[in-house]
Amino acid sequence: MPIGVPRVRFLYDEDTGQVWIDIYNRLYRERCLFLTHTINTKIGNQLAGLFIYLGIQDDPKDIFFFLNSPGGGIISGLAIYDSMQVVRPDTQTICVGLAASMACFLLVGGTITKRLAFPHARVMMHQPLSTFFETQTGDAVMEVDELLKMRENLIEVYAQRTGKPHWVISEDIERDVFLSPTEAKTYGLVDVVGVTLI
């Protein structure tokens, strides 16, 4: 029998009083966002929208972005990343399980000094992937060209946010690189290893 999503009480306003809402909506209202699935267009749009919504509120408190994801689509991931960068409040990124591929990119995209990995988390970075074995030759060439542009874009951001030279990032992402939280801190992907939010 599925457990479902628990509902909790929330004081909506003085007129309405308390209402029951699911726990994720309650946490969103406390400025806590979660990425716990593969990144796709739907997830990307939802998270980008939530970042923008929280960013336009008149509240300077940090946004907490919890990551436990195998990664996913580049375009949707970049939409989330760009939304994180344009909002006024700082974004604390927290890896609670696995931040792989595009989720690693989002982890490094948090406000510098406010990127955290829990002690038993894992971080994995690699170059963008694509499958073009079923496309026509012309389409495959265009896709490869676009993929190379995205790869350079990702390398640029990783280099800026980790302090590593471009060539180091380029060589390292040639294969899957799994890092412990301590290794991720040494690399510059996170700033803190622990369980206390900054």
From Swiss-Prot:
Component of the plastid Clp protease core complex. Belongs to the peptidase S14 family. The active site is at S101 (nucleophile), H126. It comes from the Eukaryota. One of its GO terms (molecular function) is ATP-dependent peptidase activity. Keywords: Hydrolase, Plastid, Protease, Serine protease. The keyword Hydrolase applies. Its EC number is 3.4.21.92. Transmembrane segments: none annotated. Pfam families: CLP_protease (PF00574). This is ATP-dependent Clp protease proteolytic subunit. Cleaves peptides in various proteins in a process that requires ATP hydrolysis. Has a chymotrypsin-like activity. Plays a major role in the degradation of misfolded proteins. InterPro entries: ClpP (IPR001907), ClpP/crotonase-like_dom_sf (IPR029045), ClpP/TepA (IPR023562), ClpP_His_AS (IPR033135). It catalyses: Hydrolysis of proteins to small peptides in the presence of ATP and magnesium. alpha-casein is the usual test substrate. In the absence of ATP, only oligopeptides shorter than five residues are hydrolyzed (such as succinyl-Leu-Tyr-|-NHMec, and Leu-Tyr-Leu-|-Tyr-Trp, in which cleavage of the -Tyr-|-Leu- and -Tyr-|-Trp bonds also occurs). The keyword Transferase does not apply. GO terms for biological process: protein quality control for misfolded or incompletely synthesized proteins. One of its GO terms (cellular component) is plastid stroma. It is an enzyme of class 3 (hydrolase).
